[in-house]
Amino acid sequence: MSLTAAALAWFVLASPASAATADSVRWWISSADLKQQLAEQPVLTWQTETSRKAPRIEINPTVTFQTMLGLGSSLEPATCSNLWRMSAADRERTLERLVSPSAGIGMNLMRLCIGTPDFTGDPWYSYNDLPPGETDPELKHFSIEKDRTYILPVLKLARAKNPELLFFASPWSPPGWMKSNRTIIGGQLLPRWYPAYAEYFVKFIRAYAAEGIPIYAVTIQNEPGVDRAQEKNSKWQYPSCHWTGAQECDFIRDHLGPALRRAGLNTKIWCYDHNYNVKATGDDPGLAYPRTILSDPRAAAFVNGVAFHGYAGDPSGMSLFHQEFPTVPIYFTEGSIFGIKGGVKLIEKLRNHAVAYNGWVTILDDQGKPNNGPFDASRTLITLDPKTRQPTEHFDFFLYGQFMKFIQRGAVRVNSTAGSRNFANVAFRNPDGAIVLVVVNPTAQRKLFTLAWDGRTVTVALTARSVATLVWAAGKP
């Protein structure tokens, strides 16, 4: 659906959590056919125990799990470029709908790129590119100038729409002159340039802070198991840099961690940033990679958490890692959901200890552009008509909203009856005391279920291929 005044109507409501009461349940639905878009339903009233014929979802707030940092997507160059192609009014409205907690779906954590990723229409670049054969150990030529065209203006506008918005950032490659093959595509960072690369991070964080964009956290490398220089087909070559767990451990322990501390920066380090498969397969290093880093006490002292992607393995890999390192936060930093089954996938991340969820690529045009990389993205949350420059929202936008508009920063996941991939759920207790339950029905059949809480129940009918969010007051924890 295109952005129109009518489309904004569902945003005109009180804060869902604060408006909840102890005697009733408010709830909202989005359906894959878009007949319902974060549409509020008639209020449900708690009843005494009812028939147990319908499947039950029981909530036990005394059993708790992770505390949430945030939920969001990415403001990578492709998304920023498409936002910049819109009219000023559409750009403001679209960002408001993405990040505003009151007038939008309330994304509060966004992934940025340090230099260029694959999803861009511009030539590949780092912040310290040099002619062949030259080096710059003191980083005298460091510059974020290329980000000033449209990336930084978009980020500033997003932060104006939500001052609580947090940004974390990932590089796809160090500058080519620092690497074994002297190119931004593939290869490895040479150890002699570890000190300079640590300062590269410091300069990036300071430069963005000077523009009013504080960087909450960084990862060392997007998908460090990948070396795209090894691809024979040039189509598959894009910025990348291969690291081992031991190399990243050395870099964090001896260089980046100390450099951030010397600079007086509070930016956090999230290690790994690759798939959650348990064992190494192909380009995927497996859990041995972050285990190597966190098993070194001096490196672990600088690490705030582990970042995972979802392109290989199973989300249960995050739970296995949590069992081994129970005090280390787990961040899901890249994945795409695509449709109602994506709602089940998002729940699986949250039920496997992720304290954050970030999708990847928020807005492409309806031709899948801009994109200089090899991966074709399915339809993004919002697409842009390249002729009219009008944005259109798709189901995934509303699906995200069913989670992100309701689950607050600082929410604690509470125990709820385990579902299945045909009927999934996850529950949280917000800092204001409200309980939030998200339920996904990816099947073609209407589902009836009973929600049980504190000796009372309500019965809910969830339409086919839809997601529901239920909110009620439970008092301050």
Please state what every model-predicted region is.
Residues 73, 106, 167, 218, ...:
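Conserved, mostly hydrophobic/aromatic
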Residues 2-14:
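Bacterial N-terminal signal peptides
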Residues 22, 36-216, 220, 254:
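N-terminal catalytic cores of secreted or lumenal carbohydrate-active enzymes
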Residues 461-477:
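C-terminal beta-strand-rich structural cap/linker in extracellular carbohydrate-active enzymes
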Residues 69-70, 103-110, 162-166, 211-217, ...:
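Loop/turn elements at helix/coil->beta-strand transitions in domains of secreted/extracellular proteins
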Residues 416-454, 465:
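Carbohydrate-binding surface patches
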Residues 329-399, 413-418:
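Aromatic/acidic polysaccharide-binding cleft in carbohydrate-active enzymes
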Residues 196-214, 224-340:
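Active-site neighborhood of glycoside hydrolase catalytic domains
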